[in-house]
Amino acid sequence: YALFHLVTVFPLSWIQLYDTRPVESFLLVQMGGAVLAALGILASGYIADKVGRRTTLGTLAPPIALFSVFVPSLIDGGTTGQNTFILVGFTLLGLSYGQAAGATTSNFQKHFRYTGAALTSDLAWLVGAAFAPLVALGLSANFGLGYVSLYLLSAAVATLAALSLNRKLEIRD
């Protein structure tokens, strides 16, 4: 969920504070990115039907980790770099977001399954992403954009760890 705010709220703040690009033009690119995210959500459903939700999420964590390496050069790379950051980031977001909540359903007994998954998803959103824009802006302002890369990388690693734990805790009905 950290990726969500790192391609939506954080870059708007960063552009407003540290770049000369008009925020309005950046918002147009974000709207295009939102379309890519929506297509990614649909594609993730198709992919997950073939290989499973956890496998889909686990397969997407390494590309998100790789993407994190390029955060500084893309955000600080002028209009082309920033647009690439948004479009690639939203695509990865859509592909992973589509399966995030559903991947936890197997951890709950049948009659608690969807309530448990909803609560887990909401809490993950709050803990994993609620402060992401503020943390990313603070890191970039005080230490440089490279620390935003480390932040996103830590989220990808945490995803892989959580998926591993999720598999071990799966409840079979």
Feature roles, as predicted:
Residues H111-S140:
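A late C-terminal transmembrane helix in Major Facilitator Superfamily
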Residues S96-F108:
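Intracellular juxtamembrane helix-capping segments at the cytosolic ends
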Residues K50-A61:
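Cytoplasmic membrane-interface "Motif A"-like loop-to-helix N-cap segments
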Residues P62-G77:
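C-terminal ends and interior cores of transmembrane alpha-helices
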Residues Y1-A37, A129-A132:
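Extracytoplasmic gate region of multi-pass secondary transporters
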Residues L153-D173:
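Multi-pass alpha-helical transporter architecture, strongest
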Residues Q16, I47-A48, V135-F143:
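Interfacial helix-cap and linker-helix signal at transmembrane-aqueous boundaries
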Residues G138-S154:
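A membrane-interface helix-boundary motif in multi-pass transporters
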